């Protein structure tokens, strides 16, 4: 049977961070650990989770897996030839001897300066409330970024003027440069610094962008925040980065989320935790208590004899997984609260309870004032 995708096994996206990988592994390993989960198949599930984590938590193994999958080299099911086996020349980019001499002399073969290039990627940090992260929302943001000049439409020249042959390189787009090296004086070619390799220069530069072809502006964007995003997660807005060069595509905008903590719940991945204080009578006799969930309030049955530390699990009452893998759970942690102030009647009843339980209570004062009273009374 074919192996499942490691990212699918852990329930994470392919661009998940190390923290997201670790968090997903901890949650799943705790759920399917053979010492905890006795269901059939839990052991195999745990092995699958551990194998996925072993690969994705290691940068080298993860890179190899992303490139080759389960059947590629580096122990994922097959041994194949990899260009990295010739590691002796990797420091020069694997481009052969021309690139070795290019790196040595700082010149040599150059990239085509007129080739199209993708624009730079940008990053924006968005702060969300707990509720916005859980249920999703749409927010408008304002960012400063380079955009194509509206005056010259990215050409760089003043409208109505034309370009002429570069006076520095005579239209070649590159110039000869001589350098002193350990092997003597070497002649190389470099991109023309005046026309940046285009071979042309403006008769008159655009008055708005001064020949750059771009201008820096404040841009408003609408960002749709998906349900279930967590702190430090990010989404990619394709084409919303800086404009490309020479007709290349624009870069992307990455929106990174900072999620404020909830005053009611504690979050761990898709699971949420709620602390519930119960009184001594409620814990001893049992009760039904109304508790909050993400969407409404539900009744929770507290069995008689419940102790501090008891945890109740409400399945699928947690947060929707941002990648669509169901819902997390709501865990209710119980704390039995000891009363700090009792009426005389309540004290009598407590003493009577202790006597019926075969206990002899040596009552102690609760504060300095009570202790002082007992001292002066000679008790």
Curated annotation (Swiss-Prot):
Its main location: cytoplasm. Residues 5-69 form the J domain. Binds 2 Zn(2+) ions per monomer. One of its GO terms (molecular function) is ATP binding. The keyword Metal-binding applies. Keywords: Chaperone, Cytoplasm, DNA replication, Metal-binding, Repeat, Stress response, Zinc, Zinc-finger. GO terms for cellular component: cytoplasm. Its cofactor is Zn(2+). Homodimer. This is Chaperone protein DnaJ. The gene is dnaJ.
């Amino acid at each position: 049977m074919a192996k499942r995708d490691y990212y699918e096994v852990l329930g994470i996206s392919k661009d998940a961070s190390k923290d997201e990988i670790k968090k997903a592994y901890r949650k799943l390993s705790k759920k399917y650990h053979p010492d905890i989960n006795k269901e059939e198949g839990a052991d195999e599930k745990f092995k699958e989770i551990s194998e996925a984590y072993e690969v994705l938590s290691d940068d080298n193994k993860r890179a190899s897996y992303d490139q080759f999958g389960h059947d590629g080299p580096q122990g994922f099911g097959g041994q194949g030839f990899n260009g990295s086996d010739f590691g002796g020349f990797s420091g020069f980019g694997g481009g052969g001897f021309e690139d070795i001499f290019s790196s040595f002399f700082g010149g040599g073969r150059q990239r085509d300066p007129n080739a199209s290039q993708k624009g730079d990627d940008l990053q924006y940090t968005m702060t969300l409330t707990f509720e916005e992260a859980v249920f999703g929302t749409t927010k408008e943001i304002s960012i400063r970024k380079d955009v194509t000049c509206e005056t010259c439409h990215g050409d760089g020249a003043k409208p109505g003027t034309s370009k002429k042959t570069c006076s520095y390189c005579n239209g070649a787009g590159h110039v000869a440069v001589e350098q002193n090296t350990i092997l003597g004086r070497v002649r190389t070619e470099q991109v023309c610094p005046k026309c940046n390799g285009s071979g042309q220069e403006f008769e008159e530069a655009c008055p708005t962008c001064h020949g750059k072809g771009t201008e820096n502006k404040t841009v408003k964007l609408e960002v749709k925040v998906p349900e279930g995003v967590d702190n430090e997660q990010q989404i990619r807005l394709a084409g919303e980065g800086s404009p490309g060069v020479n007709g290349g595509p624009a870069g992307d905008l990455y929106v990174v989320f900072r999620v404020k903590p909830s005053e009611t719940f504690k979050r761990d991945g898709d699971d949420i935790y709620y602390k519930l204080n119960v009184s001594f009578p409620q814990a001893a006799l049992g009760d039904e208590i109304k508790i909050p969930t993400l969407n409404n309030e539900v009744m929770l049955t507290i069995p008689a004899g419940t102790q501090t530390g008891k945890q109740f699990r409400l399945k699928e009452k947690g947060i929707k997984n941002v990648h669509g893998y169901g819902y997390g759970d709501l865990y209710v942690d119980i704390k039995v609260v000891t009363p700090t102030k009792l009426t005389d009647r309540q004290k009598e009843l407590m003493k009577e309870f202790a006597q019926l339980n075969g206990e002899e209570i040596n009552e102690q004062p609760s504060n300095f004032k009570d202790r002082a009273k007992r001292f002066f009374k000679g008790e």
